[in-house]
C-alpha cells in the first residue's frame, strides 16, 4: 500500500494595523503572543494585551509628555526620559501614574477613558493615546 505525506508551510505577515512593539528597547517583550490550535484545524493568534497601536505620536507630543512626567516626578536634569521610559522605572507608583494622566488631560484638553488610562505605562503609550484623542477631537 502506498503512503502519502505532505508538508504545509504557513507564513503569517501581520498587517500594519495589527503590528505592535514587542521590545521596549531593553530586550524584553512587552506583550506575549500565543499560538493556539484549539479545537479547530487552523491556529488562532492571541496577544496578552486587549489593544495595541502603532507608534504615530509626533516628536513634539513625546517631548511635552516627557517634560510633564519629569516635572510631576520631580526628576533631576541628569535623568534621561525617552519615549521608551516606563513610569514605574522612573519611580512612579499607581497614584503618580493617575496624576500624570490627569496632568496630560489638562495640558492637552482631552479626556482619557479609564480603560485606556490603565494601559498607559510608558511615555510612548501616553503620547499615542494623546495623538489618537486629538485626531478624534479635530
UniProtKB/Swiss-Prot annotation:
UniProt PTM comment: 4'-phosphopantetheine is transferred from CoA to a specific serine of apo-ACP by acpS. This modification is essential for activity because fatty acids are bound in thioester linkage to the sulfhydryl of the prosthetic group.
InterPro entries in UniProt: ACP, ACP-like_sf, ACP_chloroplastic, PKS_PP-bd, PP-bd_ACP, Ppantetheine_attach_site
A GO CC term attached to the entry: chloroplast
Domain Carrier: 59-134
Pathway in which this enzyme or protein is active: Lipid metabolism; fatty acid biosynthesis
Keyword annotations from UniProtKB, A to Z: Chloroplast, Fatty acid biosynthesis, Fatty acid metabolism, Lipid biosynthesis, Lipid metabolism, Phosphopantetheine, Phosphoprotein, Plastid, Transit peptide
GO molecular function: acyl carrier activity; phosphopantetheine binding
O-(pantetheine 4'-phosphoryl)serine, modified sites: 94
Transit peptide stretch: 1-56
Lineage top rank: taxon: Eukaryota
Pfam families named in the record: PP-binding
Main location: plastid
The keyword Secreted is assigned to this record: no
Subcellular compartments: Plastid, Chloroplast
Family: Belongs to the acyl carrier protein (ACP) family.
Function: Carrier of the growing fatty acid chain in fatty acid biosynthesis.
Alphabetical list of PANTHER family matching this protein: ACYL CARRIER PROTEIN (PTHR46153), ACYL CARRIER PROTEIN 4, CHLOROPLASTIC (PTHR46153:SF11)
HAMAP family: Acyl_carrier
Record's protein name: Acyl carrier protein 1, chloroplastic
Gene name as annotated: ACL1.1
